[in-house]
Amino acid sequence: MVTQKRTHYEIFWEILTFCKTPKSFTSIINRCNLNSKIGQRNLEFLKKRKFLLQVEEEGAVLFQSTEQAKQYTVLFSKTYRELFDNSPEFRL
């Protein structure tokens, strides 16, 4: 079975969906199956676009999706369903 590479848009959706509650960098790259360099680049991009907020909780740096990110995740899900007749899902 041939698997296709995920697009940036799918990766952004996965990160933003996973970060609805604050998450650590390590948990994000592990859950979204990213290497550190690409993960850092994606998080910086999403922070610059104000889709992701960096917060500190009990001395730990965490990332959380913003209200603005919700618009992206909803639109992406809708478009994905129209194109592929199913919902985007996390890869496990």
Residue ranges of predicted features:
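Basic, amphipathic "hinge/linker" alpha-helix immediately C-terminal to the N-terminal HTH DNA-binding motif
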Residues: 59-76
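Short alpha-helical segments that sit at the start of domains
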Residues: 1-13
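A short acidic, leucine-rich amphipathic alpha-helix
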Residues: 27-31
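Short capping segments at the starts of secondary-structure elements
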Residues: 19-24
